Swiss-Prot record:
The KH domain consists of approximately 70 amino acids and includes a conserved hydrophobic core, an invariant Gly-X-X-Gly motif, and an additional variable segment. The third KH domain (KH3) binds a hairpin RNA loop containing the 5'-UCAY-3' motif on targeted molecules. RNA binding by KH3 requires residues C-terminal to the KH domain. The gene is Nova1. This is RNA-binding protein Nova-1. Pfam families: KH_1 (PF00013). Keywords: mRNA processing, mRNA splicing, Neurogenesis, Nucleus, Repeat, RNA-binding. Interacts with PTBP2; the interaction is direct. It comes from Rattus norvegicus. PROSITE patterns: KH_TYPE_1. Residues 1-12 have a biased composition (Polar residues). Residues 394-474 are annotated as: Required for RNA binding. Residues 1-43 are annotated as: Disordered. The lineage of its organism: Eukaryota, Metazoa, Chordata, Craniata, Vertebrata. Residues 48-115, 146-212, 396-463 form the KH domain. The keyword RNA-binding applies.
Length: 474
């Protein structure tokens, strides 16, 4: 058990942590009072332990390998058992998959070393601001992620890692050279787990992980949370980030907002400013969810002054609830942003900022004359909504948009990929008139969107925002 740091010549020196397996299996004295009461122990037969880590989606494929060959070989070489959550089953509030490793101490370290190496091999296209595929928002990640390790541990293990007065975590940092942080501990409500974030160079992280695994080994309760899916977990879940709100955003507003940011193609827009005014009137969970969404949009380069949010509290609550309940979170994001924009337009809100900055404008704003949301300087002034009507059987909406010939390629994408992805994402059918077939008297092509009201609204929103972006960068 690590003791408190001792004073030597005016400097604090952490007590070294012995990496050899401890002889005693008794519960260490510094375990916090919040430790779970479960009887389940960490070890199985033959000294087996468990390590749960988060893996960025871009690294999962290289860890699994073609047909699962890599992960099978890794298990064979190390003797460990490795389980990953499903491809779209992310840890709440992130786009990272959960990996559970079972094995000896040596196996845990070996497997994690392999995983860390794959995380460091971030593909060039992943580091770009705009995702390679708009159906995979998780491909846009923080470049600093390659220098991080994220480990999920039960509360009891977290207490051992921290140590009395923070002595143990300080010793881990001093001995490894890595920076170690734990997700915030909430007041009142106990979380079953907390997330440990280790940041540093490869060798520093390797050493820190070894020391953390030793603490896992010491805690007889560290095998109490072996789930890899959080889809059905009730109650609060720890935030994957070491600072800020203690709880993860289980309503999926954060990843869906990130998805929408990539879909719209916005990158490196005007600087972000404070936005307390748009949050007035919101409280509780709504405020947390909206703040998370806005923070995510800000991190993706949106100028929050140009959002023009005029959404009422009642409308926001409904939109957020719909997003949380959606089976397709990316589509929910598009609908959520569209709801913000159209509600703002209906209430007469206008986008702030100067001409040339882009707003998350209303769907009806394809022409400045419709509602003035974009203003006279809008690059979409050349586009127009030709009409909205019901399909012949009355079950679907049909929306027609006029798009300048030179901007049609932005909607089509290479080989029609963007158009296909928009359709898959929203569930709407999108058709573009053939080359040379223009709206009479113009050089505009006709885009026809067919689907449910929500689907057509989302598709129309994505198309108009993509056009706005493309016009602005040309």
């Amino acid at each position: 058990m690590a003791a408190a740091p001792i004073q030597q010549n005016g400097t604090h020196t952490g007590v070294p942590i012995d990496l050899d397996p401890p002889d005693s299996r008794k519960r260490p004295l510094e375990a916090p009072p919040e430790a779970g009461s479960t009887k389940r122990t960490n070890t199985g037969e033959d000294g087996q332990y468990f390590l749960k880590v988060l893996i960025p989606s871009y690294a999962a494929g290289s860890i699994i390998g073609k047909g699962g060959q890599t992960i099978v070989q890794l298990q064979k070489e190390t003797g460990a058992t490795i389980k990953l959550s499903k491809s779209k089953d992310f840890y709440p509030g992130t786009t990272e998959r959960v990996c559970l490793i079972q094995g000896t101490i040596e196996a845990l370290n070996a497997v994690h070393g392999f995983i860390a190496e794959k995380i460091r091999e971030m593909p060039q296209n992943v580091a770009k601001t705009e995702p390679v595929s708009i159906l995979q928002p998780q491909t846009t990640v923080n470049p600093d992620r390659i220098k991080q390790v994220k480990i999920i541990v039960p509360n009891s293990t977290a207490g051992l890692i921290i140590g009395k007065g923070g002595a143990t975590v300080k010793a881990i940092m001093e001995q490894s050279g890595a920076w170690v942080q734990l997700s915030q501990k909430p007041d009142g409500i106990n979380l079953q787990e907390r997330v440990v974030t280790v940041s540093g160079e490869p060798e520093q992280n390797r050493k820190a992980v070894e020391l953390i695994i030793q603490k896992i080994q010491e805690d007889p309760q560290s095998g109490s949370c072996l789930n890899i899916s959080y889809a059905n977990v009730t109650g609060p879940v720890a935030n994957s980030n070491p600072t800020g709100f203690p709880y993860a955003n289980t309503a999926e507003v954060l990843p869906t907002a990130a998805a929408a940011a990539g879909l719209l193609g916005h990158a490196n827009l005007a600087g972000v400013a404070a936005f307390p005014a748009v949050l007035s009137g919101f409280t509780g969970n709504d405020l947390v969810a909206i703040t998370s969404a806005l923070n995510t949009l800000a991190s993706y380069g949106y100028n929050l002054n140009t959002l023009g949010l005029g959404l009422s509290q009642a409308a926001a609550t409904g939109a957020l609830a719909a997003a949380a309940a959606s089976a397709n979170p990316a589509a929910a994001a598009a609908n959520l942003l569209a709801t913000y924009a159209s509600e703002a337009s209906a209430s007469g809100s206008t986008a702030g900022g100067t001409a040339g900055t882009f707003a998350l404008g209303s769907l009806a704003a394809a022409t400045a004359a419709t509602n003035g949301y974009f203003g006279a300087a809008s690059p979409l002034a050349a586009s127009a909504i030709l009409g909205t009507e019901k399909s012949t059987d009355g079950s679907k909406d049909v929306v027609e948009i006029a798009v300048p010939e030179n901007l049609v390629g932005a909607i089509l994408g290479k080989g029609g990929k963007t158009l296909v992805e928009y359709q898959e994402l929203t569930g709407a059918r999108i058709q573009i008139s053939k080359k040379g077939e223009f709206v009479p008297g113009t050089r505009n092509r006709k885009v026809t969107i067919t689907g449910t009201p929500a689907a057509t609204q989302a598709a129309q929103y994505l198309i108009t925002q993509r056009i706005t972006y493309e016009q602005g960068v040309r």
